[in-house]
Amino acid sequence: MALSFSIYTIFSLVLSVIAWKIFYNRHLHPLSCYPGPFIWTVSRVPYAAYYAQGKLHRRVQLLHDQYGDVVRVAPDELSYRNQQAWKDIHGHSRNFPKDMRFYHISKNKAPSVLVAPDGVHRRQKRAILRAFSEPAQKSHECLLHPFVDTLIHKLQQKVEDNNSVVDITEWYNYVMFDFMALELFGESLGCLEDGVYHPWVDMLFGSIKAWAFLSQSKYFPTISWMIKIAGLLFYSDLLQHRTTKFDSIAARVPGDVESDLDQPTFTTYIKARNDPQSILSREEILSNHSFMMMAGSETTATLLSGCTFYILKHPEVHKELSCLIRNRFSSPLEITFSSLADISYLRAVLQEALRMYPPLPLGMPRVVPSGGAIVSGQFVPEKTSVAIASWATYQSSSNFKDPQSFLPERWLDMGPGDNDIKDAMQPFSVGPRACPGKMLAFAEASLILARLIWAFDLELSPQCSNWADQRAYIIWDKGPLLIKLKAPS
């Protein structure tokens, strides 16, 4: 009798605590004045569940359509989808630190430029910015051209062998991962030559879902051990493989500035010691190389994949772009960063592809600093997690006319997007932590896309007509994008 009474008492206390927590979160919490569905405002479980399933970006879009430009998506988190939020959260005059529950620290515990504290970030970014100077841009182009030549040659062989249907997503990844490996580690991964992913790249894509699952443990500290154990049970082989690959990367980071290559690389510029205020330790270089290997390759390959899909879904865009490129260039040797820079329609196509298929469709959360802050015209208390939902923002009719339509012309002067709020789209972020690789990413994507369109007529496989309807785990979980290649007509 005493035992059953004790169990009943404990059970009642637990229920009382849960009931009080629900009541507090809904009615007394500092964010209780912000709109959101009941279950999301009292518990983080719905957010975590949709995130782990890869469906968060679409669910948050629907919540914004229902509740407006700001939605409470968890007891302590707000989601935004307007232009002002970019300035208020990420602007130069702001000091909203990263929400470290969302991010990961490198295995060697040295923070990369993505997550480093402000002082460390400034020092690291000074070093990294050297790799994006105008002279550096020319070096990067010289290193990229041979990979693009190999890509075109390999695809031409496919056409000659009557094997003209290819998964272009894979080939874009081959190019970009090989290129970034050369830039960062001094040697290619050999993906293009072998026509298969290097084991390290395979591991990266295979671990997307594991990261999504395990990252949620930080949001549930009382049961984080259970989540981690479950993750180890389901993903133990993958996590061990990841550790092995990180160690192999560490062994490949060059120890000296000198390189056997004719052109300076990212590593050359980053390790140059002409500024004593921007010297990186070997551990910091390793962390940043690991980060940039993904950030500098997967995102550009994703942009190219999304752009190719939407071009081929819209024959009028494909025709216009093909005519522009083939009429302008009589030889592929003429297609360079500089010769493509003033083709405004090509830039507009890439911009619209970024809007329709942003490489990072989810928000990257920050934390409101001590004392609170005004975000999008409303006071937000300190310690609140805030993020701009990229997918929801770019697909909102309050920011873009006909947001579900692929309209490159909206980015041209006097086009149908004159009344669009274009500053609501910031795929490279804004402020002191904005991605410094914006111009290089556009140049790389322009070059690869232009060379492909110059060399081939392209046709989308019917089975890929809904290719962009994908799940997202920080990045997209892309399926095969099958296209048919033909010699240009």
Model-derived regions, located:
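Cytochrome P450 heme-binding "Cys pocket" and the immediately downstream C-terminal segment
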Residues: 315-318, 438-475
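C-terminal helix/juxtamembrane-tail motif
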Residues: 1-5, 474-489
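Cytochrome P450 heme-thiolate monooxygenase catalytic core
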Residues: 97-107, 139-302, 320
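Cytochrome P450 I-helix active-site segment
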Residues: 39, 141, 145, 196-206, ...
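Cytochrome P450 heme-thiolate "Cys pocket" and heme-binding signature region
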Residues: 130, 290, 295, 337-338, ...
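Conserved cytochrome P450 K-helix/beta-meander segment immediately N-terminal to the heme-binding cysteine loop
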Residues: 388-416
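Short, small-residue alpha-helix embedded
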Residues: 299-312, 448
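N-terminal membrane-proximal hinge/A-helix region immediately C-terminal to the signal-anchor transmembrane segment
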Residues: 2-123, 145-154, 175, 210, ...
